């Protein structure tokens, strides 16, 4: 490609709202152009990157036996009503009506469309398993689109959906997709971890996120320093804690505790560790058809993890309960406990199951119970509710958990029959019985990956592309177009590299040398071959973008040097 014929409008200034390097360099480097809030046009450089990433994803998905399809970007609202997600998904789902007043959505994901595609067509266990995927445009009406391609409203995603006749086969495919995703991100040169995750609006169980470790990451992840365990903080587990502090001595006795409303007050009043106090966190759970106060009980020195709490009560949203909400529910703020609590939905953290010698509110103003045993409750009350923190112990090996920042680039789920059962998508098993499909779904953010690669590899001058995914492998820079011999050499090398299968761009623009070098550093091709003043002495300069190291070599050795570097 000749730069003189290429379209990459570079700029010196970054957009005012571009806080992240990826956002700044994608705009300044002429990869994309913002046309609205969370909306971007792809220029030639951006489209090349998009297609290179897509090709890697396709190759590995095809190798794993998945089949490529293409769903309509617009999906019938009726399908989303059948699955139950039409109202649950919230305002991020862009809904509209056509001229005949039919409901439609612009798909942020395609579980419903995938189920509809096989429903009534795949009818026997003999046709299973089946794994279908696409790379297509999605739309999510984000309230605050930001960070460029990392959180836009319109984006490109690889989404796949598998169908199975047994849990064992679903788990096999889930593990295969985990291995396939690992191959994809390894080929793209990314430092990533597969982490346990919350399933969110997609639903199901057994999900994993693929996180690229980056200081600018928007997600908090906990990684074990001794083994491969890693998890998003929303789903992180830990080895149950123990305390060497002395436990309170009493046998479920009731004590007057005037004005001791906080955990700190109670611990100081009884002169015990907060570890032995039970904290009540009151929330208002919002459902599709009602609202109610829900109480979550955790140890006094723990914090409630909001996503875990929301999953426990299966609410659409959790908000803090107001004083009026608490009073209406018949609760006594500051003195609420699980013992004798009636007519209110409540959950207890798993680590409190069977705990002895605990202190909790007596559900009466100014009174607490001391010496409580957390037993005799229905098992459905116990849930994983606590926020795991750095320094807690790994649930797998007991090593220390370390907090890191990450950017999500992929997510895989074991959905079970959530969608197939709701949408009446069934098959006949080997015994002739009608059963709903078991499903998995698997997503990769294609457009997001472009930004993530920059976040993971850049300096103050611009992008530093890995050769596995660079828009061009090497750039030949002609510093002086009046040097006929140098120009002739540069174009002969350019043609030789093209014939050898090297992706090469030659900067033959009638621009100052400084402009050409600045653009090379900003755009970030892995290597550059500079044909400059030293060419008169048979020398050229080989530049490595990562570190901007320069090496003067014989001009006749340039082809070999480039090929070896690639």
From Swiss-Prot:
Keyword Translocase appears in the UniProt entry: no
Protein keywords: Aminoacyl-tRNA synthetase, ATP-binding, Cytoplasm, Ligase, Nucleotide-binding, Protein biosynthesis
Organism: Campylobacter concisus (strain 13826)
Gene designation per UniProt: proS
EC number: 6.1.1.15
Entry's family note: Belongs to the class-II aminoacyl-tRNA synthetase family. ProS type 1 subfamily.
The protein's name: Proline--tRNA ligase
Xref: Pfam families: HGTP_anticodon, tRNA-synt_2b, tRNA_edit
One annotated GO molecular function: aminoacyl-tRNA deacylase activity
Gene3D superfamilies: Anticodon-binding domain, Bira Bifunctional Protein, Domain 2, YbaK/aminoacyl-tRNA synthetase-associated domain
